[in-house]
């Protein structure tokens, strides 16, 4: 049996639209074994127990590339990453499927080949890269090749995810974005993306509040998330370092000083006054990324 663990990811990190992402310590686990025949799923809803399951789709892509034909498969999922909340649940399924398939087939593909294959299936290197590699990454796609670099994050920072009880599909969140942008808005984001990376790298955490600002996606998507601005304002009042929409949303991610012991309790009290229910989870950066059979990929 192959066991694969994949972390949740938070993409964009404010201005780094479709390029920055960070892995955090929420995980999906996948247990896969080859059986005599058939396709058996455990741990997911009945509507996902078929060949359209994203994990299986990813596995098949890997098997086809390698030229391996399993006799049958049993796939068990232990999922802790909330679905359609902007925490990389799709990326985790794709990465988990591809890595487990490669392992079953004898580990034919190297890490670079696995990464390119996963991005080809999932389409978002800002989620796939940190899910694979752990930590924070800056990623681009160049002629279908995935190029990335790890971003060093100084000690002394933690994250807090505010996860609502409602979902938001990536497709819907993409649909509200404009077809084109002003030149000045592009410059606005380029500068703040550079500032974000530098501030995290050098431990200049007081600059994060400036770096979190964005003009490419967050304001458009905020309209789909009830109380987004009031929550953001409350987080800022509670001395957060920065607030941003996690991926396409609706999860709101907050950066905090590691020694901050009061934020979670105070923001939870505020969220309880709102109509929707919100879960508050303090998180750390996952530095390992994907782990297969207790070893790093």
From Swiss-Prot:
Gene Ontology cellular component list: cytoplasm
Residues reported to bind ATP: 82-92
A Pfam short name: GHMP_kinases_C
GO molecular function: ATP binding; homoserine kinase activity
Keywords recorded for this protein, A-Z: Amino-acid biosynthesis, ATP-binding, Cytoplasm, Kinase, Nucleotide-binding, Threonine biosynthesis, Transferase
E.C. numbers: 2.7.1.39
Group of enzyme by EC: transferase
Compartment(s): Cytoplasm
Pathway: Amino-acid biosynthesis; L-threonine biosynthesis; L-threonine from L-aspartate: step 4/5
Gene3D superfamilies to which the protein is assigned, alphabetical: 3.30.230.10, GHMP kinase, C-terminal domain (3.30.70.890)
Catalysed reaction, written as an equation: L-homoserine + ATP = O-phospho-L-homoserine + ADP + H(+)
Family label: Belongs to the GHMP kinase family. Homoserine kinase subfamily.
Protein name as annotated: Homoserine kinase
Gene: thrB
